[in-house]
Amino acid sequence: MTAPSQVLKIRCPDDWHLHLRDGDMLKTVVPYTSEIYGRAIVMPNLAPPVTTVEAAVAYRQRILDAVPAGHDFTPLMTCYLTDSLDPNELERGFNEGVFTAAKLYPANATTNSSHGVTSVDAIMPVLERMEKIGMPLLVHGEVTHADIDIFDREARFIESVMEPLRQRLTALKVVFEHITTKDAADYVRDGNERLAATITPQHLMFNRNHMLVGGVRPHLYCLPILKRNIHQQALRELVASGFNRVFLGTDSAPHARHRKESSCGCAGCFNAPTALGSYATVFEEMNALQHFEAFCSVNGPQFYGLPVNDTFIELVREEQQVAESIALTDDTLVPFLAGETVRWSVKQ
């Protein structure tokens, strides 16, 4: 990686956690990812969720149809785990190169997760098959019991679900997605080579004070929810250390403005347009730009056993203002950092 004062040239990055939705929303948001990233792990939480090879093939085609000419982008599809999923269907999709990984959502943990897994025991035959064939498990790591405080759900998940699962299936490759706590950062750092994590730009840049002090900022509301400052700092220190089992996963999750700015607003930040520059800003603030390329472009492929991309992109350090909104057919989409001035952006 070369890093003169104003330009960062890095190998083309990948996004290892992305929501593209469907229909008109998909057509609107895909280009913001496909112009920057070589590949993206696409989340399967549509309504209904992607649980079959045929559904994944059809969804992949809808994504590819939305990629503008001249963009070189490969969507990597995932299977949504349910209590009733057939292990043979999962293995067939993996062997045919349709499914790159499978996603475990605890039931009702986040958007469109009502079909999710009620308990790990319920899907043990599926997980055992995944361990056998070397298929990565992607985990939304929160418990959903009503009596557990929302700020404690990730830490509780580690002790009650994640660690028992990894003790039981020691060869299973696991990605602890969008980690938000010091507990998770420590757990992944202290784990073995079969455990990795993704981190979003919002969890590196902000903590719960930013979302709640001086007024509620619904466009910072996502799940897992922003935590207190000590957790934000632990995440920043993890990425700044150059640790090689943490990588870029934006969790970009678009919702129309009226669904965010609501008396019961949806969780998710649409950060695809600004994520890469946001990550660069964090690495610069931490004096860790030497580790930026690995986080964006190397660590993920290494964990998944895929080649790194062979093209390069440049980020430029010059102030730019983020658009206030992006037009949808019958509403608008508010991007992460809307209306704000950002330090780094992708060179056009």
Swiss-Prot record:
Note on how the cofactor is bound: Binds 2 Zn(2+) ions per subunit.
UniProt entry keywords in alphabetical sequence: Hydrolase, Metal-binding, Pyrimidine biosynthesis, Zinc
Disulfide topology: none
Listed SUPFAM superfamilies: Metallo-dependent hydrolases
Positions bound to Zn(2+) 2: K103, H140, H178
Highest rank taxon of the organism: Bacteria
InterPro entries: Amidohydro-rel, DHOdimr, Dihydroorotase_CS, Metal_Hydrolase
Any Gene Ontology CC annotation: cytosol
Enzyme class: hydrolase
Any one Gene Ontology BP term: 'de novo' UMP biosynthetic process
Chain residues that bind substrate: H19, L20, R21, N45, H140, L223, H255, A267
Function field: Catalyzes the reversible cyclization of carbamoyl aspartate to dihydroorotate.
UniProt-recorded name of the protein: Dihydroorotase
